[in-house]
């Protein structure tokens, strides 16, 4: 009777797992041979273990899916950052090309100024030579000397002006060189950040692939547990059906035996009431 109560509790537990569905035994199910070899405690333990394992696997799969969604969002953010850095790098390249073009133009102007200065130096040397010659004939060439002095003064002013312009060009060249160095530094930093982003993106891609493989493995394991649980349900249904049938037969036999015992008792009482069972030698009832 206690075993029947325990089996009834197990049946109710299985029905609760199935959402209240009524269990039926498939006539073609071959699980009863395996189930008959299990004790009551083994059967309950096996059911509890399968149920707990199924719940644990569902929790793990849910957590892994959440991690996978988080990694996908982070990967999208890194892709957007990569696009932004690529656009910034293109702008830096254009600025660098513009600075290089300006530097080339400045170098050309500087070369022209150098040529002009060399030419002026030659003219100045020639003028000095003429001035030396004029000093020999200073008395006769005062008017010519005044003109030459004026010309020398003009040349000196021109040289001073050219030297100032040359100094300005050199200062401009230094500024452009500093700007070019700064652009190169920024370009190096951008390249390093781009390499780091690509490396991190590759690591995240590998991690996502590993998590996907883990999810597939856990899903396969969950399917195996589901199959084992279905098998156990079939075995339990078969066993409960057999136990119920045997209990019904046993109840019928007990009821028949009780009826026969009652009939025998009634017959015995009726026999004693209708027959004299007094023992002759002792005078007492037989």
Curated annotation (Swiss-Prot):
Residues 61-235 are annotated as: Helical. The lineage of its organism: Eukaryota, Metazoa, Ecdysozoa, Arthropoda, Hexapoda. Glycans are attached at residue 156. It comes from Bradysia coprophila. The DNA puff II/9 proteins have a proposed intermolecular coiled coil structure with possibly intermolecular disulfide bridges formed by numerous cysteine residues in position D of the heptad repeat. This is Puff II/9-1 protein. The keyword Cell membrane does not apply. Coiled coil: none annotated. Keywords: Coiled coil, Glycoprotein, Signal. Residues 1-19 form the signal peptide.
């Amino acid at each position: 009777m206690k075993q029947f109560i325990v089996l009834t509790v197990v049946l109710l537990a299985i029905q609760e797992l199935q959402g209240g569905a009524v269990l039926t035994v498939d006539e073609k199910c071959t699980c009863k041979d395996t189930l008959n070899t299990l004790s009551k405690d083994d059967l309950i333990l096996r059911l509890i273990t399968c149920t707990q394992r199924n719940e644990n696997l569902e929790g793990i799969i849910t957590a892994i899916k959440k991690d996978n969604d988080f990694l996908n969002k982070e990967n999208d953010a890194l892709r957007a950052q990569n696009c932004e850095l690529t656009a910034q790098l293109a702008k830096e390249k254009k600025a660098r090309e513009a600075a290089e073009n300006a530097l080339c133009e400045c170098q050309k102007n500087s070369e022209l100024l150098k040529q002009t200065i060399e030419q002026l130096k030659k003219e100045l040397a020639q003028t000095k030579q003429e001035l030396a010659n004029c000093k020999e004939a200073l008395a006769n060439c005062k008017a010519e000397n005044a003109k030459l002095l004026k010309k020398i003064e003009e040349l000196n002013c021109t040289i001073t002006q050219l030297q100032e312009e040359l100094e300005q060009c050199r200062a401009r060249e230094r500024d452009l060189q500093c700007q070019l160095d700064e652009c190169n530094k920024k370009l190096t930093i951008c390249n390093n950040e781009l390499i780091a982003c690509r490396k991190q993106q590759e690591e995240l891609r590998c991690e996502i692939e590993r998590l996907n493989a883990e999810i597939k493995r856990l899903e396969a394991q969950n399917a195996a547990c589901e199959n084992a649980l279905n098998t156990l349900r079939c075995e339990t249904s078969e066993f409960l059906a057999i136990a119920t049938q045997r209990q019904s037969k046993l109840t019928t036999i007990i009821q028949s035996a009780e009826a026969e015992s009652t009939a025998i008792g009634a017959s015995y009482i009726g026999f004693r009431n209708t027959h004299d069972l007094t023992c002759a030698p002792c005078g007492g009832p037989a």
